[in-house]
Regions:
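Active-site pocket-lining/capping segments in soluble small-molecule metabolic enzymes
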Residues: 110-112, 213, 287-353
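Catalytic core of soluble alpha/beta enzymes
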Residues: 156-297, 301, 320-331
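N-terminal start-of-chain detector that recognizes signal peptides
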Residues: 4-9, 16-18, 93-94, 202-203, ...
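N-terminal capping/lid subdomain adjacent to the active-site entrance of alpha/beta enzymes
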Residues: 1-179, 184-186, 200, 325-357
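Active-site donor-binding loop signature of nucleotide-sugar glycosyltransferases
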Residues: 48, 209, 314
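Short glycine- and Lys/Arg-enriched binding-loop motifs that mark or flank ligand-binding interfaces
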Residues: 42, 120, 150, 261, ...
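A short pocket-lining beta-strand/turn micro-motif at the edge of beta-sheets
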Residues: 70, 77-80, 255, 280-286, ...
Length: 357
């Protein structure tokens, strides 16, 4: 974009609880916010927040790379001329900041009924904790109106996790609450099928990434023999949807793809994956990847334009104790955009790391 000036902000987001995954505990997550300003006073925001241990751009050099990119943009270099092939979160942030500016800079990136009050169907996420705590959290979410609940599993003894799901099913049958599982690649290939057969007893909709990615033959066998539908998540990271998706979908036979724009290179890249799911008769849903409310806002507004009836994985600002206030509101299994609520955005005196020159 011509005559646009860019600034870079950083906020260390602090989890409001002990966030655990099968890859370990997370206490903070760095959010990098790009602010674009035009001579007419239009301001847009985008977010680049790669996930450590997962995103291909979550490296020690990332902040310096991002500073250099902002410097290049302020020197008049077009974003399309920059090599961002290994920086998917930056592609997402620049795509969304430019969408924001192009649409008037009101944090309204797409024109949809979502912005006019039509809510989006979403799943409730149960973070990894002790099995008892997870059970209690799932019950609370079901009582709060969520009829699709996703459990992160794989960190505890298999029998313990089965008993947790059994206890949940005693209170909420499959007609009342759909269960999704996410193993984050925690199962070993030779143990995955027996575990999936055990988990099938609890009427499971799907399980994300039962084994670690890049094990094509093992994943192919699991997809073919599993009694539970398989969803691919981490498997997509670093792949090109236009050249790699056909081989992935045809070989594995996976039923669902999980699309995370921060990890895949933005909304346009996610739409390329959607085209592949249509070609191979698969389904998908989108999931946020621990972004702040700025990144979540962009993803939620985009998913609202896709007319996907499946529950989306749109985690909300309640994850963090120092997130940005937002018009987004999660209630009774739906995500709402409350147009009368205002944003709070980064403060220059505290969080600005690249100034206008």
């Amino acid at each position: 974009m011509k005559n646009v000036r860019y600034q870079l902000f950083k906020r260390s987001l602090a989890f409001s609880f002990e966030a655990k995954t099968s890859r370990g505990a997370i206490q903070t997550h760095d959010a990098y916010l790009i602010k674009a300003s035009t001579p007419k006073g239009i301001i847009g925001w985008g977010e680049a927040s790669p996930l450590k241990g997962l995103s291909i751009d979550a490296t020690p050099q990332f902040e310096n790379q991002l500073k250099e990119i902002i410097s290049n943009l302020n020197q008049g270099i077009d974003a399309r001329e920059l090599d961002l092939s290994k920086l998917p979160s930056v592609r997402f942030s620049l795509e969304t900041v430019h969408l924001d500016v192009a649409n008037g800079g009101q944090m309204r990136l797409f024109n949809s009924t979502f912005l006019q009050g039509t809510p989006q169907y979403m799943n409730g996420l149960v973070w990894m904790n002790t099995p008892q705590h997870m059970l209690e959290e799932a019950i609370l979410k079901a009582q709060a109106g969520y009829d699709c609940i996703k459990f992160k599993i794989g960190a505890h003894e298999h029998d313990e996790e089965c008993r947790m799901l059994e206890q949940f099913r005693k209170k909420f049958n499959a007609n009342k609450v759909q269960i999704r599982l996410d193993a984050n690649g925690a199962f070993l290939p030779d143990e995955a099928l027996p575990k999936l057969k055990d988990l099938h007893a609890f009427t499971i909709h799907s399980i994300e990434q039962p084994i670690a990615p890049k094990q094509m033959e093992a994943m192919q066998e699991i997809c073919a023999k599993s009694p539970i539908n398989i969803a691919l998540d981490e498997e997509l990271i670093g792949l090109n949807p236009n050249t790699d998706a056909g081989n992935l979908l045809a070989k594995t036979g996976a039923h669902f793809l999980i699309l995370k724009p921060t990890l895949l290179g933005g909304l346009a890249a996610a739409e390329d994956w959607i085209k592949q799911t249509q070609k191979y008769n698969r389904q998908w849903w989108a999931t946020s990847a621990l972004e702040s409310n700025i990144g979540l806002n962009a993803i939620a507004q985009w998913t609202a334009t896709q007319n996907n009836p499946l529950p989306q994985g749109l985690g909300t600002g309640a994850l963090y104790s120092n997130n940005f206030e937002t018009p987004l509101l999660a209630e009774k299994g739906y995500l709402y955009y409350i147009a009368t609520k205002n944003w709070t955005l980064p403060e220059e005196k505290e969080e600005l790391i690249v100034h206008l020159s």
